[in-house]
UniProtKB/Swiss-Prot annotation:
Membrane topology field: Multi-pass membrane protein
Organism: Formosania lacustris (Oriental stream loach)
GO biological process, one term: electron transport coupled proton transport
Alphabetized InterPro entries for the sequence: NADH_DH_su5_C (IPR010934), NADHpl_OxRdtase_5_subgr (IPR018393), ND/Mrp_TM (IPR001750), NU5C-like (IPR003945), Proton_antipo_N (IPR001516)
Catalytic activity, as annotated: a ubiquinone + NADH + 5 H(+)(in) = a ubiquinol + NAD(+) + 4 H(+)(out)
Protein name per Swiss-Prot or TrEMBL: NADH-ubiquinone oxidoreductase chain 5
């Protein structure tokens, strides 16, 4: 066997084994060491990250990809299911990034969750979550991908509902689970179609055999699956609701794991989509609508975690637009750069929330650049990277995506919406920085502000370096897998930067207007629409349920109580008794006085006649 594929396969299988080992040790019936979370889980993830750099280096040097099939799970006459790993461009680049980000999040969680009595179980859940995501990324067939897909789904349910004593956390966990179930219907139906028509779930065979079939139906199922998992418009409300979970969960969920799983599914299977115009147009329009709607919702939110959550959904919409433009490698590049600064934004938010006695309202913050200088600086860096500031990580992916949009002849409506959403990104990002870092403190004076802890500083510092240089490193070392779009005039090339600058100025104007009151009732309809999330949760979660409840009450009262129960109960008994009484009364008319009078008169007459 050639040494290069051997190095790739053995290294990445070793990574998976190292990650599984702490989970297996937790099955030991003996009581665990209180330090198990940091000694086993964090060490395992950091070691796995270092090992995963070896196959990445080999791939960058040799350009070699490999597939490992090492176990036949099930064989029938027409159908085989194998355990098969695909170590290609996507899995070799994504795995180290996921491990690096998770390592930082786990270290931060050791500080954030130190007082939780079940911290070891929490770390085990986070590790299982990561294993499920790596299983999904490295899968070479739909069955194995489905295992990873369901794994991240069930672990997200357990982690979002971690504080299960709170009704909101339970509701959010159920909401995430139910919305993902809707998406899972699409994936299961697509897998059933592939099994019936192509007789294979192996990805290479699907690519080869799909040329002879119209793939519109399974592609719609895959897009539905991605809509549920990656929180696209229509199935998006679970994403902001998931903020009820602990902040490390939000960071892991929104950066490099669950929410990008749907986009990754479409990237992995893009070969069967690239010539299907209906599927591409669906992705383009769905992504544009998601990006604009969620960015508009983020403009007026006051919960710092909700704003970052809506920004995630907006960026996922941008990735979906990129897939619709037939540029999956740009969507993957944005996944990679987005992981660093989004995880860092959540960790900075967690540090601020912890320091302000669990306060999440940005209107009650302010002046933190003096009290939490490191966290505030990293929050600003992350926000700048998110808006696509030149030479930070987000610039290399967002600029390439906007350039591809500007040179595209596709749907101008969708591309215009996406550009507007990009400008909104600058508005809400700068709004967060303004309210959190600038101005004077608006929080209680007795807040236990302290960021001088290595478990806080080190993970945020690592992610800050990633947010600054990751885009440059990835674009410098990895050649595009598809031919890039052609160049454009400098004026058009500057369009992305101009849109971001306009967004920043708009944010400054909005921030200064916040302290000025021009109307007695300043809340406008547009503000209300944005603040109420477009009335989407109210309509979906309340309107239909209220109609069903009203219909049920009418059926229960009018049909059951007033009809069947009345007929079988009091009214039924009375009608039966009335009939019997009528039959009885026909034989005896009830004129007793008349009868007695006639009887007495007859008796008197008879007596009189007898005496004569």
């Amino acid at each position: 066997m050639h040494p290069t594929p051997l190095i790739l396969s053995s290294s990445l299988l070793l990574v998976i084994i190292i990650l599984i080992y702490p989970v297996l040790t937790s099955l030991n019936p003996n009581p665990q060491n209180p330090k198990w979370a940091t000694s086993h889980v964090k060490t395992a993830v950091s070691s796995a990250f270092l090992i995963s750099l070896l196959p990445l280096a080999v791939f960058l040097d040799q350009g070699t990809e490999t597939i490992v099939t090492n176990w036949h799970w099930m064989n029938t006459t027409m159908f085989d299911i194998n355990i098969s790993f695909k170590f290609d461009y996507y899995s070799l680049v994504f795995t180290p990034i996921a491990l690096y980000v998770t390592w930082s999040i786990l270290e931060f969680a050791s500080w954030y969750m130190h007082a939780d009595p079940y911290v070891n179980r929490f770390f085990k859940y986070l590790l299982t979550f990561l294993i499920a995501m790596i299983t999904l990324v490295t899968a070479n067939n739909m069955f194995q991908l489905f295992i990873g897909w369901e794994g991240v789904g069930i672990m997200s349910f357990l982690l979002i509902g971690w504080w299960y004593g709170r009704a909101d956390a339970n509701t959010a966990a159920l909401q995430a689970w139910i919305y993902n179930r809707v998406g899972d219907i699409g994936l299961i139906m697509s897998m059933a179609w592939l099994a019936m028509n192509l007789n294979s779930w192996e990805i290479q065979q699907i690519f080869f055999l799909s040329k002879d079939f119209d793939m519109t139906l399974p592609l719609m199922g895959l897009i539905l699956a991605a809509t549920g998992k990656s929180a696209q418009f229509g199935l998006h409300p679970w994403l902001p609701a998931a903020m009820e979970g602990p902040t490390p969960v939000s960071a892991l969920l929104h950066s490099s794991t669950m929410v990008v799983a749907g986009i990754f599914l479409l990237i992995r299977l893009h070969a069967i989509m690239e010539n299907n115009q209906l599927a591409l147009t669906t992705c383009l329009c769905l992504g544009a609508l998601t990006s604009l709607f969620t960015a508009a919702c983020a403009l007026t939110q006051n919960d710092i975690k909700k704003i970052v959550a809506f920004s995630t959904s907006s960026q996922l919409g941008l990735m979906m637009v990129t897939i619709g433009l037939n540029q999956p490698q740009l969507a993957f590049l944005h996944i990679c750069t987005h992981a660093f600064f989004k995880a860092m934004l959540f960790l900075c938010s967690g540090s601020i929330i912890h320091s302000l006695n669990d306060e999440q309202d940005i209107r009650k913050m302010g002046g933190l650049q003096n009290l939490l200088p490191f966290t505030s600086t990293c929050l600003t860096i992350g926000s700048l990277a998110l808006t696509g500031t030149p030479f930070l990580a987000g610039f290399f992916s967002k600029d390439a995506i906007i350039e591809a949009m500007n040179t595209s002849y596709l749907n101008a409506w969708a591309l215009t919406l996406t550009l507007i959403a990009t400008s909104f990104t600058a508005v809400y990002s700068f709004r967060v920085v303004f309210f959190v870092s600038m101005g004077t403190p608006r929080f209680l004076p007795l807040s236990p502000i302290n960021e001088n802890n290595p478990a806080v500083i080190n993970p945020i510092k690592r992610l800050a370096w990633g947010s600054i240089i990751a885009g440059l490193i990835i674009t410098s070392n990895l050649l595009p897998s598809k031919s890039p779009v052609m160049t454009m005039p400098p004026t058009l090339k500057m369009a992305a930067l101009m849109v971001t600058a306009i967004g920043l100025f708009t944010a400054m104007e909005l921030a200064t207007l916040t302290s000025k009151q021009y109307k007695t009732n300043p809340i406008t309809q547009t503000h209300h629409f944005s603040n109420m999330l477009g009335f989407f949760p109210s309509v979906v979660h309340r309107l239909m349920k209220k109609l069903n409840l009203t219909l049920g009450q009418l059926a229960a009262t009018q049909m059951v109580d007033q009809t069947w129960f009345e007929a079988a109960g009091p009214k039924g008994a009375s009608s039966t008794q009335i009939k019997m009484a009528k039959i009885t009364s026909d034989t005896q008319r009830g004129m007793i006085k008349t009868y007695l009078t006639i009887f007495l008169l007859t008796t008197a007459l008879a007596t009189r006649l007898a005496t004569i």
